[in-house]
C-alpha cells in the first residue's frame, strides 16, 4: 500500500497569460513517517511527437516527512518558449506533476492544457510565428488524470544496487513490444491505465 496519498490538488491562477508561473496547491497525507525526501516535479510536455521537448519546470525536495496531512503550493516558471516547436505552441498539450520516493515515481497527475490567443482576431488568423505574449493558458483543472505506480517503500539505495548487480544479464534485457515507450499526449497521461483513475 502506498505510504503517501494525494488528497487534493488545486490549480491556482487559471486561466492566465502563457508567461505566468504554474501554481498548484497540493494536499497529501503520509500514513507513517518517511525518513527520506519526496521529490515533486512539474513537467511541461512541449510536443506530443517527442519526449525530447519535455521541460522539467521545477523540482522540489520535501522531507523528511512526518506522518499526517500536509499542504504546500508548488510554483514553477512558465516553459522556455524557445524550446517549444512552433507547430506545438498553440493548441492542446499536457502538464504533469510527479512525485518520487527514493528515486521511484509512485504518482503522476496530468492535466490537459489549452494555449490559445485571447484576441479573437489572432484566434481567427493565427500568425505563422507564435506570439507567446498574446497566448492564454487554460488548464482543464476539473479532469486530472491520476496514475499510481507500485514501488518498494522500504528499499534502500544499497539494496537497489545489490538487486541490479544480482540480475541475470541474459534475462529481461529487452522490453516486450507492449511495454515499448509510446508517443503522444495520451501516452503522457496514460502510462499505466489499469492503475489509474480519472479524478482524485
From Swiss-Prot:
Would you kindly state one Gene Ontology biological process term found in this protein's UniProt entry?
DNA replication-dependent chromatin assembly
Any matching Pfam family: ASF1_hist_chap
- For whether the record's keyword set contains Chaperone, the answer is yes
Q: Tell me where on the tree of life, at the top rank, the source sits.
A: Eukaryota
Signal peptide extent: none
Which GO terms label this protein's molecular function in UniProt?
histone binding
Assigned GO CC terms: chromatin; nucleus
Is this entry keyworded Transcription? yes
Q: Which UniProt keywords apply?
A: Chaperone, Chromatin regulator, Nucleus, Transcription, Transcription regulation
| Localization per record | Nucleus
Q: State the PANTHER family in the record.
A: ANTI-SILENCING PROTEIN 1, HISTONE CHAPERONE ASF1B
Q: What does this protein do?
A: Histone chaperone that facilitates histone deposition and histone exchange and removal during nucleosome assembly and disassembly.
- SUBUNIT field: Interacts with histone H3 (including both histone H3.1 and H3.3) and histone H4.
**What is the name of this protein?**
Histone chaperone asf1a-B
Please name the source species: Xenopus laevis
> Which gene holds the coding sequence for this protein?
asf1ab
